[in-house]
Amino acid sequence: MPYGDSSYRGNCSGYLVKDLICHFRPARVLDPMEGSGTTRDVCRECKVQYTGMDLKNGFDLVNDEIKGTFDFIFFHPPYWDIIKYDGDQHDLSNSPTYDIFMGKLRICVSKLYETLERGGTLAILIGDKKKNGDLYPLFNEIINWRIGRLTQIIIKEQHNMRSNETSYSGSFIPIHHEYVLIFRKEA
């Protein structure tokens, strides 16, 4: 993969990010949870001004303020209780309960929306979570927050997942997709 680090757990395809950047043609892009740098690499190739932040570099989106405004934000947060990136208590994936996770995620999404320029786009890549037979449709909760004008929902197929390597007993059906929610801040 020419973007980011394909061995980084939770990495997304740079081709998705590139398609979004080529479609929306932003001047300033923010990725507040940049992980392995996929969005950074795409922006470098497309010659778009980029700002990347991440908890591993000392930026905590829940508690820290974002400096500047952006006309495109790509947000691919960690999911609750799936991948443990480290033991940092501020890592969303380490939230002890689903409700605490969703509360922190809502703070993040609200901050990002406020950081958007008028007419700007917030793209959120999010999947569903299954635990103990229950489905947690994260995308649906975000949509119900009504943070801006939802203009598109893209269903993205997932590849190279650890769940593909696992044998499940019973009638468990693994999740093989994520959603890209496209919100627009009205001009």
Provide a role label for each language-model segment.
Residues 1-187:
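Class I S-adenosyl-L-methionine-dependent methyltransferase catalytic core
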